[in-house]
Amino acid sequence: MEIKLISGALGAEVNGIDLKDSSLENWKKINNLLLEHKALFFRDQDITSEEQINLAKHFGPLERHIYVKGRKDYPEILRIIKAPEEKRQWGETWHTDVSYNPKPTKVIILRSIKVPPVGGDTMFSNMEIAYDTLSDKIKDKVNDKRAIHSSLGAAAFVDAYKEMEGNGNLDEYSNSHPVVRTHPETGKKILYVNSMYTKRILDLDENESSDILNEIFLHQERLDFTCRFKWTEN
């Protein structure tokens, strides 16, 4: 097995692991690497949808998107399709996927089928480092606080893409989560807020909440917390 770091903050390209192998032993290797590097990238993995589902099941219960229809045969798989003339980018702002759900999602598995000749890169940011480097003043303000996450940030994308079909639901879903979470496997503290879905910190007045969130959002975007991945097919 070969590990190539994407950046100093997070991310590793992994060679020598076959994602078609959905055995518990293979999953444990992947999970251990994920806990260490936060984001993993595998090249030339021509897996089927069924094999993707089999791998995903090891991480926990599968989820469906609340606004966009999944595939008919595999409804947990959401197709992200952008036609050449469409200008908006799916997930174009910094976010934590579906953080408005009642329980934080452990893993998102993305598989590239067809990619543009230029552009389309995805960036990831390490929220463990983001918390560690947060000022003591902000830490003291948010360590014991919860924040509201709203799905309306995702609803804005519904029907924006002609190849992606909404399921007819535009209701708002919201849940509160700790601003600072302790990862259940590593025991490390991480920031669990994001500019797309987090709307307000509870038990703070609206202005103070807005000021603190905006400061955190800017902090999260520091390039030295990030890695950038250029997709290729499979």
Which stretches of residues belong to each language-model region?
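Non-heme Fe(II) oxygenase catalytic core, chiefly the N-lobe of the double-stranded beta-helix
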Residues: 1-233
